[in-house]
Swiss-Prot record:
One Pfam short name: PsaA_PsaB
Binding locations of [4Fe-4S] cluster: C559, C568
EC category: oxidoreductase
Protein name as annotated: Photosystem I P700 chlorophyll a apoprotein A2
Cited function: PsaA and PsaB bind P700, the primary electron donor of photosystem I (PSI), as well as the electron acceptors A0, A1 and FX. PSI is a plastocyanin-ferredoxin oxidoreductase, converting photonic excitation into a charge separation, which transfers an electron from the donor P700 chlorophyll pair to the spectroscopically characterized acceptors A0, A1, FX, FA and FB in turn. Oxidized P700 is reduced on the lumenal side of the thylakoid membrane by plastocyanin.
Family named by the database record: Belongs to the PsaA/PsaB family.
Subunit field text: The PsaA/B heterodimer binds the P700 chlorophyll special pair and subsequent electron acceptors. PSI consists of a core antenna complex that captures photons, and an electron transfer chain that converts photonic excitation into a charge separation. The eukaryotic PSI reaction center is composed of at least 11 subunits.
Amino acid sequence: MALRFPRFSQGLAQDPTTRRIWFGIATAHDFESHDDITEERLYQNIFASHFGQLAIIFLWTSGNLFHVAWQGNFESWVQDPLHVRPIAHAIWDPHFGQPAVEAFTRGGALGPVNIAYSGVYQWWYTIGLRTNEDLYTGALFLLFLSAISLIAGWLHLQPKWKPSVSWFKNAESRLNHHLSGLFGVSSLAWTGHLVHVAIPASRGESVRWNNFLDVLPHPQGLGPLFTGQWNLYAQNPDSSSHLFGTAEGAGTAILTLLGGFHPQTQSLWLTDIAHHHLAIAFIFLVAGHMYRTNFGIGHSMKDLLDAHIPPGGRLGRGHKGLYDTINNSLHFQLGLALASLGVITSLVAQHMYSLPAYAFIAQDFTTQAALYTHHQYIAGFIMTGAFAHGAILVIRDYNPEQNEDNVLARMLDHKEAIISHLSWASLFLGFHTLGLYVHNDVMLAFGTPEKQILIEPIFAQWIQSAHGKTSYGFDVLLSSTSGPAFNAGRSIWLPGWLNAVNENSNSLFLTIGPGDFLVHHAIALGLHTTTLILVKGALDARGSKLMPDKKDFGYSFPCDGPGRGGTCDISAWDAFYLAVFWMLNTIGWVTFYWHWKHITLWQGNVSQFNESSTYLMGWLRDYLWLNSSQLINGYNPFGMNSLSVWAWMFLFGHLVWATGFMFLISWRGYWQELIETLAWAHERTPLANLIRWRDKPVALSIVQARLVGLAHFSVGYIFTYAAFLIASTSGKFG
């Protein structure tokens, strides 16, 4: 009995039903609930697993490099980045007939291949890689790092190398090491790589291990650094006629503030990027020396937080008690980390397309669309996870005595006001936005488009103008050519910025109108409603008017019977579950908006977006239906084409998505009866009755069925849109 899964829970291991398997999987990572767990073992297990995570990441990235070097066309892509399609890897599929082989043999390959829409070619090219040998070297190095990480993980599980709890809770040392060591030193090292390898490569000079000690990154070497004439490093930048990867039109500057984009590659100037990383390195190296460790100087986090008591008295005891609450709660720390990471991931999505850092990536439209969508979805899952762990913190780790009258306690005390205000904002946004869309729909349907309600986003246009966009005619700040801000800026900073903002061939400050105004508010509705559900779930996790003792039931309970006026669907888990649907819905609107706006921009028919995006039928007909034609046409009487795989994935995604509803809209009794019937039939059928269950089959619990349904819904939803996005974009701009 002792060796049955799950080893971490004797109670579950002895369960005679299939519940043993499902609950075992569900609680495998909930270390806190495992048998014989101590605080020390909890911290040590998590710490060791981080090394495993790093090993997987290094192995994965190593695999990317290896497969491109082995099966890709990196060297021929480097010769002509705009016209050669980058190959991710070869496809070996015994089912392929001749038409399929022909359809997927692309990019100069000898057999069927996958095209890379991840941007890795552009990235590797920008940072100075040029040959397959470079890629193999990188793959081997990352494989080595992966092995080192695995060894480190194993090592930190050995008794002699297990860190103590006090080491894990030493906040100041961890801050110093992460700020200086992780961010500071790595940013400085990256600046070094850009200056010593990437910038010379962009000027046609190859710097490798055999010559990097002989090649000066700047004609004057370290002279200007030691004499304080740092401005010399910014003089003689690459000219606007510079051909990337060659010496033609190249300069000698290494750290600049040019602003705008390299005219040929449409990406940020590499010398600007190096300068940025140097500044980041400086800030973080300083920040990593601010906290008090063994030397008795610097800040103590506890003293800092305890001193944060606003004098007006309107925030009570301010941050008193927060240090211990955060430092003793892994869920609090994880929640904060996920919230920050989620926001950063969304910012990455926004900045990768508007300020592209990699050479030629802005002209690879499918990659731009794929990267934006990918990062927004990742951000959504990470952000909802932040609230999930926030709710678990409130249930498991929050101590009311420790936090009396501080900001955390006051949040919980006036939660009704927070929830009702969020609710009001969501209702207001929803009804007004839908009202405008539907009104416009009706006007179009009745043939009177001039009666639409079209609102210009004047405040957003004013902000764009203040930053230098002249087309709206606001004549304010940087868009006012006679103003002091404009004149001062010409000589000091970012001369290329104003050109970039006012050029229509990039995605920086796109021209916006009534369609943007409407979809902006639709997205605002989605964001506020998602937030409402998540915030309510966390704030009510310990108890609500209906169920004051909710915290005793844990994070994910389905119901507490029929009493109390109905206690089903009110656990913190239920809030998370509902919020994920809203999150997916919202990101759907975000990505639809981004994609349609950009397709019309790239095709040169922005008027289609401007005219059709002001009413719902326009979105359904001119975006979704019009752009799914390639997918619906993936297989036709003329045989297959290179979009067929996406057509199949589009169908398959819908299937997975629809399967989710089977778990989401059903009664447990039905499933139990179905399972009993299947088991009965199996046991009475020759051959099938040779296989016997050791566990009695039981239906999934309510919470489990919802999780399975949600997983199918999410995966199907994202698969379907990914296929739509890639096929419709690559079909137009192949």
